[in-house]
Amino acid sequence: MMYKQISHLEAWELVKKRDIVIADVRDQDSYEEEHIANALHLSMAKLQEYSEKADKEKPVLVYCYHGISSQSVAQHLVEQGFKEVYSLIGGFETWKAHHPTSDANKN
């Protein structure tokens, strides 16, 4: 199985309509400054632990800065048995240009 690359519009619909895990794989400071609402910070150090403990049936949307690093993380999650994994094309920068964001104080 492969992960699917999706546009910010597809991601927006997915986030609005489904119970989905949103995984931010950028650095901690960037995450704390601003992120997609309800995203969890998934550093490379936390990735293996997450892969072992998370519900693999629940869809996961992975994003990074520009949509490059998220692809390798998405592929890793698929290889770990996650059934439905998405990578955000254009990453957080594209999301931010079109949709609301949140910060550490707001969630």
UniProtKB/Swiss-Prot annotation:
Catalytic activity: thiosulfate + hydrogen cyanide = thiocyanate + sulfite + 2 H(+); thiosulfate + [thioredoxin]-dithiol = [thioredoxin]-disulfide + hydrogen sulfide + sulfite + 2 H(+)
GO molecular function: thiosulfate-cyanide sulfurtransferase activity
Domain Rhodanese: 16-104
Residues at the active site: 64 (cysteine persulfide intermediate)
Documented EC number(s): 2.8.1.1
SUPFAM superfamilies attached to this UniProt entry: Rhodanese/Cell cycle control phosphatase (SSF52821)
Gene3D superfamilies according to UniProt: Rhodanese-like domain
GO CC annotations on file: cytoplasm
Alphabetical GO biological process terms: glycerol metabolic process
PROSITE patterns for the chain: RHODANESE_3
Compartments in which it is found: Cytoplasm
Keywords from the named record: Cytoplasm, Transferase
First-tier enzyme category under EC: transferase
Membrane-crossing segments per the record: none
HAMAP family on file: Thiosulf_sulfurtr
Family membership: Belongs to the GlpE family.
Function according to Swiss-Prot or TrEMBL: Transferase that catalyzes the transfer of sulfur from thiosulfate to thiophilic acceptors such as cyanide or dithiols. May function in a CysM-independent thiosulfate assimilation pathway by catalyzing the conversion of thiosulfate to sulfite, which can then be used for L-cysteine biosynthesis.
Protein name per UniProt: Thiosulfate sulfurtransferase GlpE
Protein source organism: Coxiella burnetii (strain RSA 493 / Nine Mile phase I)
Taxonomic lineage of the native organism: Bacteria, Pseudomonadati, Pseudomonadota, Gammaproteobacteria, Legionellales
